[in-house]
Each structure stands twice: as C-alpha cells, then as structure tokens.
A protein has these predicted regions:
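Short, aromatic- and glycine-rich surface loops/edge beta-strands on solvent-exposed regions
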Residues: 181-204, 309-323
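Glycine- and small hydrophobic-rich membrane-insertion segments that are intrinsically disordered
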Residues: 39-59, 68, 72-74, 270, ...
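Sec/Tat signal peptide C-region and signal peptidase I cleavage site
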Residues: 16-22
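Exposed aromatic-hydrophobic patches
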Residues: 182-185, 298-306
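Proline/serine/threonine-rich low-complexity linkers at boundaries of modular beta-sandwich domains
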Residues: 204-216
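Exoplasmic/lumenal beta-rich domain surfaces
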Residues: 253-303
Length: 410
C-alpha cells in the first residue's frame, strides 16, 4: 500500500511535459536533407590570369546538395530520384546516385609523415569598430605552440547540429550532385512548388516549398570604404529572409610568415565553424551571446591596423531559415506509437566574399557582388563518399594552419 502511495506521489510531482514524453517514437525509415546555398562570389574585379584558377566557392551562383538516407536495403541495384518543379529549370528530376564506397587502405603506422611545424605567428582579432580593442591581438607563435595552447587558440563555438544522411550512417544512401549529373543550378532557378522523392529503398516523400524556403537573396556589398582613421567600412544590402550574419577576414601580416585573422564577433571567436549552415535556434542563441550579428545589421567596420596590406579576404554569411517536416504527423493520442516514415530538412544560407581594398578617391577595387553580372555558374563538384569529421582540438594547429596557408598561397 505504501509503495502505491509513493508511486502516485512521484507521478503527481512530475511536470506535464515530462509525462507527455512517454509516447513511443519509431525513427523514420528515410531521412532527406536539402542544403541550399546562394553564393555571391567575389565582390571585386579578378586580376588577369587568376579567374581560371579560382575555386568554385569564389565563382558565385546557386548551389544545392541533396542527401537521402534510408534504413531499408535496395531491391536490386539502388536507385532514387528527386522530381523537381518546373521553375528550377533542370528538367523533370535529379538522380540520387548511390556512391560505390571503397574500403580505405590500412595504415601501417599512426604517425603523420610529412608534417612540418609551421613558422611564424597567427594574430587573432575580433569585433566591429574603428579601433582595435584592448587585449588584442591574441598572438599564437607556431614555433612554441603545444596541443593544449592550440586547443585554446583554435577552439570553435559549440553548435548543436543534427547529423545528416551519409554512407556510414545509412543502410542505403543517395546523393546529388554526383558523377552522373553535376549540372549547375540556373541563375533564375526556383525551388517553389511540389517535390517528390522516390526510389527502391525509400518511402515516397512528397512536400511543397514556399517562397520563404526558396533560394535566399544574394549578398550585395556596397563599395568598401577606408575611413580617415584607416579602418575598412563594409556595407551590405539586407537579406530579407536572413536570421543573422557573421563575417571573418584573413590576410598576411607585416612579417611574411604571419597570418592575421579577424571576426565580427563581439567576443573572441575565430569563427571558422560558423561559416556554414546553422539552425535558427542556434543563430538566436549566438545573437544573444553577441557572436552573430542581428538580421537588421547592414554594416561592420574592420578596425584600423588589423590588416596592413590590401590583399585581405573578407568572408560573409547570411544564415537562413529551415524547413523541417515529419510524415506522418505526431498522433495526438500519447498511447499511439508514432511510426515515422520520413523526415525532411531544407536548410539555407547566402554567402559572399570581397577584398578589403580601396582605390584612391574612395572607389573600391571592384564592384558589388551581384548575380546579374556574373557568368554562367560552374558545374557543382560531386561530394565525397562521406562527410569529413570536425577536427579535434589536438589537430587544430595542423589543420587550421594548413587551411589558412593554402588560402594565402603559402
């Protein structure tokens, strides 16, 4: 009798939300992700001879990555496709190819031959404004850097992100673009309308995309202006559907072996992990923490003295909304099992880059980033068989420096 009274008392003490979480949920058979980007490209004139060597990220245009994962095995050879609306101007459908994953060769040693400790320093700045703030820069000397210092210096902001479909996470997997179809998305292409995913290893997925979940507006920079104090004032047009903005810049220091980095965050943050899709709830949190700029922001000034040369790259991202769907909807009866057939995530971002440079008389070297003036987009590169893992703190000094030196051409 006492045990029954105690159990009843415990149940009464539990809050209603906790009691409601007792509904049994079976995970979806299929998970479908659409990663949709509008890339503004380089908001500047390209020096002769360099345009052909520019990576796809600098060329601008609309891009899309489609990933389908399923817990079902394929009946015969795996095949699936995404039937698209006519407004996308890419035919009736896009093939979701299942990549042939080859076993990686066995490494005979855990050592990493060929790694040479870099020379020079990294100078880390942050914050918008005319002048550098007290306590900056944080200086990292590669010659004396140990893994613990690297972990502190290169630690990125913790972001809560779901993990999308990938060959290692799904029994059967399909992706686009791929080796059979890597067509570029037309400049006027639109996602608005009805979509259907079908195949021999997935339940049929049907959904509609509205205006807010279509490709975001391209980021358009105004002329970069050098202030009387030597700072670089960068302005951009407001992106209507943006949930927030973030910017980073990098360049060479006065010493040729020095790398200078800056971010728009109000607190110390290198920001490399933030230059990607981020869920809206996380963007809201980062705005409260003064890491991400609110969506009404239209300008940021890189402080004077951060970049001494006019060869520094300014990278910018406008975060977009997400469309998240589950089929069938959750039963209202908590005793009924929620057997999910499929889930969909459509995530959005708009990116651009420009040089922190100005001509005499206040005219920036180049022009604003605008899709109307760009050439036809290049074909999208097919994705690798699996998504790369985020580097561990112990790898930060190696991977971070390799990436930055590669960008700077050293």
């Amino acid at each position: 009798m006492k045990s029954r009274i105690l159990a009843a008392a415990l149940m009464a003490a539990l809050p209603p939300p906790l009691l409601a979480q007792t509904q049994q949920i079976r995970p979806p058979i299929a998970v479908y992700w659409m990663s949709v980007e509008t890339a503004g490209g380089m908001g500047m004139e390209i020096p002769p001879g360099i345009g052909g060597r520019m990576p796809p990220g600098m060329q601008g245009g609309k891009r899309m990555n489609l990933d389908l994962g399923s817990s079902r095995p394929a009946v015969g050879e795996a095949h699936a496709s995404h039937a698209i609306p006519a407004g996308l101007s890419m035919g009736q459908s896009l093939p979701l190819l299942t990549p042939h994953v080859e076993r990686a060769p066995v490494r005979e040693s855990d050592d990493e031959p060929g790694f040479e400790r870099p020379k020079g320093r990294m100078l880390i700045y942050w914050g918008c404004g005319e002048t550098v703030r007290p306590g900056q820069p944080v200086i990292i000397d590669f010659a004396s850097l140990n893994p613990q210092d690297a972990a502190r210096a290169f630690r990125g902001r913790a972001i809560a992100r779901a993990r999308g479909p990938a060959p290692g996470r799904s029994r059967t997997y399909g992706t686009w673009p791929n080796q059979e179809d890597a067509r570029p998305v037309p400049a006027a292409g639109s996602l608005q309308g009805e979509h259907t995913i079908s195949g021999n290893y997935t339940p049929e997925i049907r959904f509609a995309v509205g205006e807010r979940d279509d490709f975001m507006q391209a980021v358009a920079f105004g002329p970069v202006r050098k202030t009387s104090g030597g700072a670089f004032a960068v302005k951009w047009n407001k992106v209507p559907t943006a949930t927030g903005y973030f910017a980073t810049a990098m360049g060479q220091g006065e010493n040729k072996n020095d790398i200078v980095t800056w971010s728009s965050s109000e607190i110390q943050e290198m920001g490399q992990v933030l230059m990607d899709y981020i869920p809206p709830a996380e963007v809201e949190r980062l705005i409260r923490e003064k890491v991400v700029m609110p969506p009404q922001t239209t300008e940021c000034t890189v402080p004077a003295g951060v970049f001494k040369s006019e060869a520094s790259m300014f990278n910018f991202i406008a975060y977009g909304d997400e469309l998240n769907l589950v089929h069938p909807p959750r039963p209202t009866d908590p005793k009924q099992v929620w057997e999910q057939e499929w889930t969909l995530k459509l995530r959005l971002k708009s990116t651009a880059m420009t040089m922190l440079a100005e001509r005499e008389g206040g005219e920036r070297r180049g022009r604003s980033s605008s899709p109307e003036r760009r050439s036809e987009p290049a074909a999208q590169a097919p994705p690798q068989a699996d998504k790369p893992q985020e580097p561990t703190p112990a790898d930060a000094v190696k991977e971070g420096v390799k990436a930055l030196r590669g960008i700077l051409g050293r």
